[in-house]
Amino acid sequence: MASKNDTRRAVVRAFFRREYKAAGNFHTADGVLYSYSWPIERLDENGRAVETEKTYQQYSKTTSEHQAMARLAISNPGYF
């Protein structure tokens, strides 16, 4: 079973890989990425994200949590 950190890394990797180029999902200011809310639950066998409403709610809790994850991804590009 994947650890919590492994799961979070997979979610963020999938999000950045799939949604970074989609219009309107990211807003950049001062080198920080803001406001994402795409629902991602897990990766399928082809590495594509599988979305559900449940995970949309889970990952849309707070803007500050989103900003913290975006800052982590920017400051540690090799982490994900």
PLM region spans:
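Terminal leader/tail segments of proteins
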Residues: M1-F80
